[in-house]
Amino acid sequence: DRGAAWTAAIMGVPARTVIVLGAPDCAAMVHRVAALCADPVEEVRLERKSPLAAAASPVKLADLGRGDALIAFSRREVLSLRAALMARGRSVACVYGALSPEVRRAEARRFREGQADILVATDAIGMGLNFGPLRRVVFSALAKWDGREQRPLSVQDIKQIGGRAGRFGHQDE
């Protein structure tokens, strides 16, 4: 979806070394862009060191706990879920794309420092903020509006967002 933006970012960055982190299926694109610039590419593949698994059954709001992230796909849904959790006495941090970078960072810090038990966020969660240890990532839906249509989440969407949970060296349990 964001090929042009990635190409511009990779080709336009004024740096001697560019490190691109991504899913294995983006490697071919990185090689093609680098070839256009006659730049060398060193590809390093890493394996996830902690398992990522789907839950056997849906998770209820009442079963969310400290360190959980609940992912929604609209600001309206994020705010609705936040209100429902707060009505249950839970402390909640929220992150979605329309928030300013400063507010997103502040909310991430509140969650990371334990001032909020649960994080409710859009898929902006996968875009570079440090939330600290996420116990698990729970999806409120398995489809999202992509700007043109409502579509099922792809395996890559789920891996990118869900992969924020249980990162090696970040879990106490």
Predicted features along the sequence, with ranges:
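Conserved ATPase-coupling elements of RecA-like P-loop NTPase cores
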Residues: 1-6, 81, 129-133
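Conserved catalytic network of the ASCE P-loop NTPase/AAA+ motor domain
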Residues: 11-15, 60-64, 86-87, 110-113, ...
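Short glycine-/polar-rich loops that comprise or flank the Walker A/P-loop
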Residues: 13-17, 37-41, 65-67, 88-92, ...
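Conserved nucleotide-binding/hydrolysis micro-motifs of P-loop NTPases
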Residues: 15, 24-28, 48-53, 75-78, ...
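Conserved strand-helix element at the start of the C-terminal RecA-like helicase core
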Residues: 19-22, 26-27, 64-88, 92-96
